[in-house]
Regions:
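Pair of pore-lining "gating" transmembrane helices in MFS-fold secondary transporters
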Residues: 33-53, 133-134
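A late C-terminal transmembrane helix in Major Facilitator Superfamily
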Residues: 137, 147-185, 189, 194-195
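Short amphipathic helix-loop junctions that connect adjacent transmembrane helices
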Residues: 56-71
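Small-residue hotspots at the loop-to-helix junctions and early N-terminal turns
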Residues: 70-78, 162-163
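Helix-to-loop junctions at the C-terminal end of transmembrane segments
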Residues: 86-100
């Protein structure tokens, strides 16, 4: 509520200086040349790319190969949407107990399970959505862990690290999704191979 500005006092008394464009470019360069940053940022980027690619391709599979309408697909898409909610909830509950790195190891197991399911399952709505649910459950676990690990050593450069991590997600996911679709990604089993490839890389 905008009226809160008049009811509460500002608690931040010291303001940080706005970095110059040259300093920001140096920070971005340092991040891109850091093995630590790139290791965990790439996990975030590829997991996000996998979600974007699936969101791009799955409606085509459901509508073109099964004959489903857009309204019907919107209802079925609630199933994988629950995967993201479930993944982040599980992550928030268990991660404080076992730590980021151990939690992150759950993702390859879920992704390989999703890949095997999508490769062998019949092309029917429920089966396809279960495969997508498993995959996005893994994404929901991986993304918060990777983001937390990316930010850990960069408390003094939190803004630059967050911007590079988030911006990289959008750029990489767009390029990956566009490339895969242009290469002919249009079947559920194609998607399963992509999941296996991304799992092997990360």
């Amino acid at each position: 509520d905008w009226s809160s500005e008049f009811r509460f006092k500002e608690t931040i008394t010291r303001r940080s200086a706005i970095p110059s464009p040259a300093k920001m470019l140096v920070q971005y360069r340092d991040l891109l040349s850091s093995r630590y940053f790139m290791s965990f940022a790439s996990i975030s980027w590829l997991n996000f790319s996998l979600m974007i690619t699936t969101v791009s391709v799955m409606p085509f599979i459901m509508q073109d190969q099964i004959g489903m309408t857009s309204d019907e697909y919107a209802m079925w898409a609630l199933i994988p949407a629950l995967g993201m909610l479930g993944g982040t909830t599980i992550c928030n509950r268990i991660r404080p107990v076992i730590g980021n790195k151990k939690m992150l190891l759950c993702t390859p197991v879920l992704h390989i399970s999703a890949a095997l399911w999508l490769f062998f399952c019949p092309v029917e709505p429920l089966y396809l959505m279960i495969g997508q649910l498993l995959m996005i459950l893994g994404n929901g676990i991986a993304l918060p862990c990777a983001q937390a690990l990316v930010m850990q050593p960069y408390k003094e450069q939190a803004g630059a690290a967050a911007a590079m991590s988030g911006g990289g997600q959008m750029v990489v996911s767009s390029l990956v999704s566009m490339t895969l679709v242009q290469l002919g990604l249009s079947e559920a089993w194609h998607l399963s191979l992509v999941v296996v490839l991304f799992t092997a890389i990360t």
